[in-house]
């Protein structure tokens, strides 16, 4: 394999997982903070808020997993390999 393609694949894999983790990381922090604030304001709605929060966190985490899949594809099943 060409060393330039190898290097570009490694850099691309690093960028894909790094950039895929930034958005969900910020979103999860914001969502958790707002959930804690909502529970503090309305303790009787704790179960409903917690359920929605966990579902939202799972959807946000899926974006990071997609970035991981792209990174693994670039590293191990390199589509640019000739």
Swiss-Prot record:
Entry's Gene Ontology molecular function annotations: lipid binding; proton-transporting ATP synthase activity, rotational mechanism
Keyword check for Transcription regulation: no
Compartments where located: Plastid, Chloroplast thylakoid membrane
UniProt keyword Hydrolase present: no
Function: F(1)F(0) ATP synthase produces ATP from ADP in the presence of a proton or sodium gradient. F-type ATPases consist of two structural domains, F(1) containing the extramembraneous catalytic core and F(0) containing the membrane proton channel, linked together by a central stalk and a peripheral stalk. During catalysis, ATP synthesis in the catalytic domain of F(1) is coupled via a rotary mechanism of the central stalk subunits to proton translocation.
Misc: In plastids the F-type ATPase is also known as CF(1)CF(0).
Subunit record text: F-type ATPases have 2 components, F(1) - the catalytic core - and F(0) - the membrane proton channel. F(1) has five subunits: alpha(3), beta(3), gamma(1), delta(1), epsilon(1). F(0) has four main subunits: a(1), b(1), b'(1) and c(10-14). The alpha and beta chains form an alternating ring which encloses part of the gamma chain. F(1) is attached to F(0) by a central stalk formed by the gamma and epsilon chains, while a peripheral stalk is formed by the delta, b and b' chains.
Protein name in UniProt: ATP synthase subunit c, chloroplastic
Species of origin: Phaeodactylum tricornutum (strain CCAP 1055/1)
């Amino acid at each position: 394999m060409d060393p330039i393609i190898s290097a570009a694949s490694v850099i691309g894999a690093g960028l894909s997982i790094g950039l895929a983790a930034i958005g969900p990381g910020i979103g999860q922090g914001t969502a958790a903070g707002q959930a804690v604030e909502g529970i503090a304001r309305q303790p009787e709605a704790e179960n409903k808020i917690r359920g929605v929060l966990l579902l939202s966190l799972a959807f946000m985490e899926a974006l990071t997993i997609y970035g991981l899949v792209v990174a693994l594809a670039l590293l191990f099943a390199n589509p640019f390999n000739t």
